[in-house]
Structures are given as C-alpha cells and as structure tokens.
C-alpha cells in the first residue's frame, strides 16, 4: 500500500496539467468567438478591414522616383469589401444631409490621428509628409514636410521653399483624399490606409455635389450608394457597352458643369440688393429656372443608367451601335476600295495576295487599295460596295464591329488562320445592318462576354465557312432580318447557339451547331401574331448540346385565351392544325424519305416471315435498321410538323381578331399568298441532352 501512495500526487499533477491546458483552450476559444461572433457593442472594432481575421494590405512600389518609400496597395478592393464598409461602418442608414457627419464619426474611430507618413499627391507634384493631427469634421490632415525632403514635380518650378509656402497658406492642412499612406510592416497603419481609401473612393466615384439637396426622407445607401457602386464595378469589369459608358461619363461632366453654374447664379442672387437690381434679378431667375430644369433632366438620365433594369430597357438599345451610326452609302468620289488588313506583310504574302485576290478584283487598274492593321478600322473606313480582305493572323478588337453598308469581309485563308478576338464584356461583337453583308473564312472568338457574337438587325447577312466561338448567345436574327449561313461551325454558347425572332428569315445549310445550351431557339411571340420566322434547315449537324437541338418558344393556350376573350374554341385549334395541315397549300418538308424507310422495313419484315426464319431475330434486325435510318428523318419531321401547325394556329388567331373588328380576309386555306416556306430536311440531331426538339410555353 505504501508503494501505491505516490501515484496520487502524480494524478494531481496530471489534473493540474489538464486544467492549465483546458484554461488555455478556453481563452483561445473565447478569442475565436470574439472575432466570429462580436457583440453589437464590439461591431465597430475592426471597421471592415478584417484585420483581426488575418488580412493584411500588400505593398505597392511607386513608378517614377525610386527614392519614395513603398505605399499600401488599396486601389484593388473587391465590390463586397467596399459594400460592407459603406453599409455597416461608414454610412449605415444615414440620410443625405447626414453623410458628412457619419463619415466624420467613422474616421474618428478608425483613423490613427498622428505618427504616420504619407505621400501628398496632387496633379502638379508628389511630396513626402508626416501627419501630426487629423481634423475629422473637415476631412483634413495637419502635416509637415519630412526630412530629407522628397518631391517629384511635374513642373520645373517646384522647390522646398515653394511647398513650405503652400503649406503655410493652407495652415498646414491637406485633404485626406490627397494622401497615400506609406507602407509599414508593423501593421499599425493598415486600417488607416484602408480608411482613407474608402473615403477617397467615396468622394471620387459615389458622391455627387447635388446629393445634399435631395429629399431627406430616404436611406442614402440604398438609394444612391449601392446602385452607383454596382455601376462602377460593372464598368470596371466591362459589363456595359463602351458607348453607354462614354455617355454616362459625359452626362456626369455636364451635370457637374450645370450644377456649378446654377450654384454660382444662386449665390449671386442671394448677395444682390433686390431693390436696385430687380430687373436683372428677374432675368437671372428665368435663367436659373432653365438651369434647374436642365439639371433635373440630366439627373433623370443618370438614374436610368444607374438602375440595372432601366439601363437594359432604355439605354442598351441606344448604344448597340445601330442607333448611333448611319449608312454612308456610295463613296462621294465613286468607285470601290479594297481594304487589306494585316499586322505585317511579307513580300511572298503580298505576291500571293496580289495574284489570287487583288488582280481578279482589279479589272480597273486605278482601283484604290488601302492597308490597315485593325479589322475594326477597316470596316469603319468602308463605303457601299467595298471589300475587306483580312490576312492570316490574330486580331484583337475592343469595340463593336458595326456594319451599316453593303460590304464583303473575307478572310484570306482558312478560318482558323484568320482570327478576330473580342476584348471587353459589355459591347456586342458584330452588328449587321447593311442591305447585303457577306462574311467568309473568318473565325470570331469571344471571351467573358455578356452580349451575343453576331446580331443581324436588318438586311441580309451571309456567313460562309466561318467559325464562331461564342460565350453567351451565338447568332441572333432580329425581326425583318435575313440570314444565310453556310458551312460554318458555331459552338460554346451558354444560351442558344442561334436565336430566330418573328418576322425573320433564316437559311441554314451544312452547318455544325454544338456544345451550346440549346442549338436553335425559335421565338414565336403572340404579340407579333402574323409574322412568323421563315426557316430553311438542310444538312446541318446539331449535336452535343446541353438541352434540345431546336426549341420553339410559343404562348401557352391559357395565355391565348386570356389575351382574347372571344376565342372560346382555342383549345381545339392545336388538335385541328395537324389534321388540316395535309390539305393546306403550305409547302411541306420532304418527308417521303422517312415513309419510304418505313415501307422498306415492313417489306423486309414480310419477306422474313415468308421465309419462316426466326421471328425474334427478324424483328430485331428490322427495328435496328429502321431506327438507324429514321433517326434524323424523324427529328426533321417533328420540327417541320410543329412549325407548320404553329403557322396555321397563328393565322387563325389573326383572322379571328380581325373578324371582331369587322375586317374580312381571304380564305383560311389560302396560305400560299403569305409566302410561308418551311423546309427542314437532311439534318442530323445527335447526342443532345433533351432530344431533337422541344417546346417552351410561356
């Protein structure tokens, strides 16, 4: 028993050991909880910097004078970082009149008042200073020049004495927005650098001089800060057309100029003696009212661009290119010009180009040839009837190729050798508006785009032997436009490879459409009752799409009933359409091949029965051969049948609506006068996720 007694002290030591470790774990757990689950009273301790979670600001080396110290890199913050800071720490639910007060409180809690160095950055010079104090209410810092004196001037007259004199005039006060905090490895001034960046960004990108005069009953962050912040990052990430961005910046400059004039006029009126200058005041009042109306109009336009939905509805179409440009027509001096595009031209290339393309085109020896380095520049220089020849190479463009005149764009070589790559997410790639446009032997490549690759707004466009590497939507054929697409390859669209609108005409021959969300999307809206897409599809291969090879978008029967109360027999229309289509005068697709295959299969089956062979084996052979031969023909038949039935349905709906207005039309079966033509033959539909054809009802 005596030998066992020492075990108890050992156990006591182990208890102390576990108790100490347990206390240490509790302290660490408490620290984690304090970071992850802060109380409301502690919620302002980090002010959006995430410093306590281990985030540190990187340093950046200034370009230019290498004597300057490194700075904190704060200009590459993400959207959510700025969003959270403005919402949770800086502005909260303040009103427009309370913005400066809230920012001053934020600075007082988050900013180190002294002891840090910064570069005072202006348009004229950069100079190293030390901050001795901060006036939070006026957003100014009290500074002094550092020793040794470091200055980088953009003019030759800046000296140590001139900077000292300037500081004396300004009472040593410098706006916080003009300070860039010098990098410090200790981490003490990370929060200071980040705070100044948030204030600087707010006054440069978010705040407007007229915000204080807005109604004071709404949440400033919700009404102004959030949409402006989102718009800034949409512009930064190229999600908005460049034309709309230019318009937005122009509107901002106009608004600031008009507001400054209006403010000056208002101040002058308030300082005048109303008795001695009454007549002048009346003129100024009228001028002020005009400025006020102009300012309100500019603010309305800015709000349209700021709101994502209104921006899409009212602004995108005006900046798509077709609304901003007009066709040039024939060249004033007459004649045709050949535009040759090449980044570099060797003698061999020039000889081959001259022999194979230029000489056959140049029946007139005086025909002008212009050379360009950019396809966009060449297209913009074109007049009616010009030819653009693009030599092999990779061409990167940053704007919209807007084709307004009847021109021809031809790649000299194979499509994989003539590549046009689009940079910028917001702009469309190619817009076709010319009466007759032809593009051949060119590969178009999109990266991270939000618009389609080619849009035909009007006229006739021919795509021959082209490759289209899409990002969102592929080719869009708008109302009253016509597309002839031959022997081309289209792939990669996250939406539909092709969108065909009502009233358009689309001819597809020998193309490949693959690896898209859907192959072809045919839009048949009830609003455009009598204008249906006219489609010819022959010998295309539509394969490996995520959804359907072909999708028809049409209104549901319930929608049709609600849109026209007198259509009580609407539910019988779809059933009668297919039954009546055989007796109509509409040109039907060539379905005899499918019926012939079926007849052959039946004959072979009968022949096998007569020979009294194994009935199981005979049945399997017949079904297998029939399935292989009819796979493509069945898909063509289903699509054509549905389109023809939909044509008759819309025709009867249109006539029924006209009859309610007392308008008498031709006989229902006389559809040939409408020139309806649907030909869908010889197409192959393979490995599409949902099948060859689908219908989407809305």
UniProtKB/Swiss-Prot annotation:
It holds the Pfam family Beta_helix. Its main location: other. It comes from the Eukaryota. It is found in: Midbody; Cytoplasm, Cytoskeleton, Spindle. SUPFAM superfamilies: Pectin lyase-like (SSF51126). GO terms for cellular component: cytoplasm; midbody; spindle. One of its GO terms (biological process) is fibroblast growth factor receptor signaling pathway. PbH1 repeats lie at residues 480-502, 503-524, 532-554. Keywords: Cytoplasm, Cytoskeleton, Repeat. InterPro entries: Beta_helix (IPR039448), Pectin_lyas_fold (IPR012334), Pectin_lyase_fold/virulence (IPR011050), SHCBP1-like (IPR045140). The keyword Cytoplasm applies. May play a role in signaling pathways governing cellular proliferation. This is SHC SH2 domain-binding protein 1 homolog B. It comes from Xenopus laevis.
